[in-house]
Curated annotation (Swiss-Prot):
Gene3D superfamilies documented for this protein: 3.10.450.220, PUA domain
UniProt xrefs under Pfam families: pre-PUA_NIP7, UPF0113
Organism ancestry: Archaea, Methanobacteriati, Methanobacteriota, Thermococci, Thermococcales
Family membership: Belongs to the UPF0113 family.
Protein name: UPF0113 protein PH0281
Any one GO MF annotation of this record: RNA binding
InterPro entries linked: NIP7_N, PUA_sf, UPF0113_PUA
Native source organism of the sequence: Pyrococcus horikoshii (strain ATCC 700860 / DSM 12428 / JCM 9974 / NBRC 100139 / OT-3)
Disulfide bonding pattern of the chain: none
Amino acid sequence: MRIGKRRKMSGELRVRRVSSWEFDLILREAEKYGELSHEFFSIVEGEYRDVYAVNESVWKLVEKLPLKPYSLGTFVGTIRVDDNLVEKFYPNIEFFSLVKVTKNYAVLGPKASFLFTTGKDVPKRAVKKLNWQGSRKILIYNDLGDIIGIGMINPRNDEKFIKNLKDVGEFLRR
């Protein structure tokens, strides 16, 4: 069971493959950044619909289990309804390890990368490389090629050019 307020464990969890509609939501999110390189996902339904990347051989084993797991594979995000009542896939950072990223990303130098992983925003001068094609959200890489987070670009503000939305240091700051 996860710790925190994210999931209430009341009621029955349901484990199933993603539907074609849910896969389209996942695919559309990936296409904002490049090409999805993984095709098999499962859903664990409770209060939320958590999305996990699994392979088919693992899925075949899960289908045979008498008890269904509350998680399996790699957790890559959640499908939920947003404030405008639109169903949307909200990826986490691990999701992007399944995407061949070709657009909407920024590369930061060592100091800016460190500061980003401590929750700080990024000034324009700290961006070593930017491939931005109009998406509000962009992926953030360090200069070693590691994905370190997700940010929101603000082209009108040079001091807070990229707002930190989510980073790999988040877990350690809890």
